[in-house]
Amino acid sequence: MKTLCLLFAVLCLVTWTQARGAEVEENLTAQDGEVDIAGDNGDVQLTLNTDDFESFTLKTLTLGHPRVKRHSCVCRRICAARQVRKGRCSRRRRICCLY
């Protein structure tokens, strides 16, 4: 019975973790104007740990175009209509990327 309860608890934890995947934040620092996200599944919201770069290149495969490996991003208060909100910059601005 204990094994069954433990198995059920693990299953619930895995399901809960997957459901919260869209809320996961990843803190990154831009280096040479580029941010590299190797394992981004598209649900990660980023927090950029720098105020130095007003614009940068986001290296990921998951902003809607699987063949595009780099996206041009900027830190703005409001994202334009053709931009995807990918997180926030450290000055209460959003990371807005062209898709």
From Swiss-Prot:
Q: Which GO terms describe its biological process?
A: defense response to bacterium
Where, subcellularly, is it found? Secreted
Which UniProt keyword terms apply here?
Antibiotic, Antimicrobial, Cleavage on pair of basic residues, Defensin, Disulfide bond, Secreted, Signal
GO cellular component terms, alphabetically, are: extracellular region
Q: Which cysteines are joined by disulfide bonds?
A: C73-C97, C75-C89, C79-C96
* Highest taxon above the source species: Eukaryota
Q: Where is the signal peptide?
A: 1-21
Stated family: Belongs to the alpha-defensin family.
Q: What name does the UniProt record give this protein?
A: Defensin-A4
Q: Which organism is it from?
A: Ornithorhynchus anatinus
